[in-house]
């Protein structure tokens, strides 16, 4: 009987340790696929020149705590990768609502999309949701920027830029 118990425990242990932790996107995966056409209804900052740049697009809202928590990281990425990367925050809220938010301060490009065109194509079901698009228009990273174990970090961005930057 003891042998059967040990055998069962061993099989259970192997099964549990073999399980892979998966990243839940809360959206349709576009990894390594063409990104949907870029669309906003109104820029709240000047419109960036996107040609030849990587785009980090953050779908967010002022009422979303995790969205606001990610803003300082996105500010950091915008400064750190200024030569290669454009960070854009897109909210579906009213212009006045977004402009009224003072803390944390957004130090990257900002726009609203009241039509939610890109959100619908990406089938986003949870925010914040970030996509990182290479200069050829392919999604190279997608997800929640602070998701434990799958965080979007400077190292991740650097690796993607080095791999997909046009020479």
What do the PLM-derived regions correspond to, one by one?
Residues 100-106, 113-160:
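Thiol/disulfide oxidoreductase modules built on the thioredoxin-like
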Residues 68-106, 115-120:
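Structural microenvironment flanking redox-active thiols in thiol-disulfide oxidoreductases
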Residues 1-22:
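Bacterial Sec-dependent N-terminal signal peptides
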Residues 62-69, 129:
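C-type cytochrome heme c attachment motif
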Residues 53-55, 59-63, 94, 126:
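Short pre-active-site segment immediately N-terminal to redox-active cysteine/selenocysteine motifs
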Residues 30-55:
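A short beta-strand-turn-helix
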Residues 15-37, 167:
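N-proximal helix/coil linker or "cap" segments that precede and/or mark the start of modular domains
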Residues 56-57, 87, 130:
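Hydrophobic beta-strand anchors of alpha/beta hydrolase catalytic cores
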């Amino acid at each position: 009987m003891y042998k059967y118990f040990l055998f069962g425990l061993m099989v259970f242990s192997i099964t549990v340790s073999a399980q892979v932790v998966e990243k839940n996107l809360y959206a349709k995966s576009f990894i390594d696929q063409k990104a949907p056409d870029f669309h906003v209804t109104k820029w709240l900052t000047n419109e960036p020149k996107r040609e030849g740049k990587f785009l980090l697009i953050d779908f967010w809202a002022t009422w979303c705590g995790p969205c606001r928590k990610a803003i300082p990281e996105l500010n950091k990425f915008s400064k750190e990768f200024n030569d290669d990367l454009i960070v854009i925050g897109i909210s579906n809220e009213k212009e006045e609502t977004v402009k009224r938010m003072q803390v944390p301060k957004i130090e990257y490009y900002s726009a609203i999309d009241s039509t939610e065109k890109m959100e619908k194509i990406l089938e986003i079901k949870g925010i914040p949701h970030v996509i990182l698009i290479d200069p050829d228009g392919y999604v190279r990273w997608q997800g929640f920027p602070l998701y434990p174990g799958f965080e979007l970090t400077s190292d991740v961005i650097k690796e993607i830029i080095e791999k997909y930057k046009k020479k």
